[in-house]
Each structure stands twice: as structure tokens, then as C-alpha cells.
Amino acid sequence: MPRFLVAALYKFAPLDADGKLQADLKSACEHHNVFGTLLLAPEGINGTIAGPSAGVHVILAELRALPGFDTLEHKESHADTQPFLRMKVRLKREIVTMGVTDIDPVDDVGTYVEPEDWNDLISAPDVVTIDTRNDYEVRIGQFEGAINPHTVSFREFPDWFRQFRETRPDARIAMYCTGGIRCEKATAFARMEGVDDVFHLKGGILKYLETVPEAQSRWRGECFVFDRRVAVKHGLELGSHTLCHACREPLGPEDLRSPDHVVGVSCPHCVEGRTPEQRERYAERHRQEEMARARGEWHLGQPGAVRETDG
């Protein structure tokens, strides 16, 4: 039976995000052997944590005890090994960085659509489905027929969306992301831009994969996650992807068979952009990682939380 409970969580609500709260939460997590990342900002909390089930639920209870966070929701999955190397609690300006002011992800967002109703929505001929995630995430899995904005970061989404709206000004829009948080902001932004018919998948891809039977699913591929599992598939089972330790791109079976893939050094996505000196440095880091693994230790240079959690 899996030893670790993984909880992905977020909530938009006013928060007094200060150093004391940061220190208190980190201390509580470490006391209960809970690792992961929590982002604190004036607009709310976002993160993923993992550890013994009892410890994770203690931390969730502490978060829900904060004023305005009693309705914080989380999504659970499980892992046989700890998917994080350490606990990080960070103070940020935004819990998911879009860089747009004046949007209201608390009170003015799109219409939530339950996972069991999602297929009907995105099958409608007048609905355009948009993946709000970044290109490296979309590459390994997405919903059938969804548009990939090819963004490198979520900051690029507003400009892309404005250009898209010029070509489809009257479209009904369905948006989705990993756990729901980016869609809160993306649909709030769409509302600010004057879009009335905008919908988003409640609980994100993770809730859909947990809820909808694979035989009925419109999802194709795997879902990138922001921890050492790299990707999950239907039923939130561990996926087949791993990471390139040089560029942190997700690698599937075909990537691993490529002659450009050298474990710890390069992959098809970064081989052309690395100097001989960089490759030597990556090779030495990989050697240190293997030595640490042989001793039953973690080498802190290993990719842990792949990128800061976007949700």
C-alpha cells in the first residue's frame, strides 16, 4: 500500500501572508514529516504537500483554521516514495503568477463544470477548449481537440488570449489546467476582457482523471505534476514519464530511446543548446547523485519539485 499521501491544494482568499505564518507553517510541516511547497500571497494559498496521511491532514486542518480558508479544498493521490526532497514555504506576490492586476479570482470567475459533465461541454460544436498550461505540460497530454497556446509561462497567457479573441470573438470557451488554480485566474481574466460564456473544469485534470472512467475519457496522454512523480495517468496512477536532469523537460519512452538522451546530461529537447562544459558539469552531478543513491541518501542537486507548483 502506498506510504505517502499527496495533497494538491489552493484557495483564493485574502491572506495576511507574513514571515510569522511562513515560519509557523514550515515548522508544523517539518514536525509532521510533511514535505512539498506552499506559496503564500495576499490573494491566497497554493501548493502540494506529501507525507504520512495523519501528518498531511494535520497541516490541512491548520490551513483551514486560517480566517477565510475553512472551505479550502484539496485533491488526494498516493505515492510509494516521498515525491519531494524538502519543505518550502514561500511568500509571493501571487500564488500563480499571471502578472495582471485588477482581476478578481475570488468573486468573478467562469462557470465551474463538474468532471462528469465536462465531456458534454467540450463536445458541443460552439465550444472552444483551451489548455491554460504551458507547452512542456501540454506536450505529454491534453483533452481531445484542445487548443495549445504554446506558452512558456503563465505570464504569456493574457497576450495570447487577447490575440485569440480577435479571431473568435463570439466563441463559448472552456478552459482547464492541472488542478484548477490557473483556470480561476484565466477565466477571471476572460471575464475582465468581456467574455460572458467561459467555463472551467472544477478540480482540473487531476479530478477528471480521478473521477471519469478511462473508457469514457476524452483525455489523451498523461498529466504533468509538479513533483518527483513527473506525471500521472487515469486513476492518478504513476505515469511513464521521467525528467531530463539537464533541462527538466518531461521525457516519455520515445525520448528515452533517442540517441540524444544521455542520462543526467541531455535529451532530445536540450541537446542542441548545451555546451561541452555544461555537459561535463551535468555528468559530474549525475555521478554524485548515483553515489548518494547507492548510500541510500538524496543528493540535493536532484530535481525535486520540477518547477514551482502552478496547479
From Swiss-Prot:
Reactions mediated catalytically: uridine(34) in tRNA + AH2 + O2 = 5-hydroxyuridine(34) in tRNA + A + H2O
Catalytic residue positions: C177
One of the GO BP terms on file: tRNA modification
Amino acid composition bias (Basic and acidic residues), ranges on this chain: 277-298
Keyword list, A-Z: Oxidoreductase, tRNA processing
EC code: 1.14.-.-
InterPro entries attached to this UniProt entry: Rhodanese-like_dom (IPR001763), Rhodanese-like_dom_sf (IPR036873), TrhO (IPR020936), TRHO_N (IPR040503)
Ranges for domain Rhodanese: 123-217
One MF term in the entry's GO annotations: oxidoreductase activity, acting on paired donors, with incorporation or reduction of molecular oxygen
Domain of life of the source: Bacteria
Gene3D superfamilies: 3.30.70.100, Rhodanese-like domain (3.40.250.10)
Residue segments, region Disordered: 277-311
Function according to Swiss-Prot or TrEMBL: Catalyzes oxygen-dependent 5-hydroxyuridine (ho5U) modification at position 34 in tRNAs.
PANTHER family for the chain: RHODANESE-LIKE DOMAIN-CONTAINING PROTEIN 7-RELATED, THIOSULFATE SULFURTRANSFERASE/RHODANESE-LIKE DOMAIN-CONTAINING PROTEIN 2
Family classification: Belongs to the TrhO family.
Protein name (database record): tRNA uridine(34) hydroxylase
Native source species: Maricaulis maris (strain MCS10)
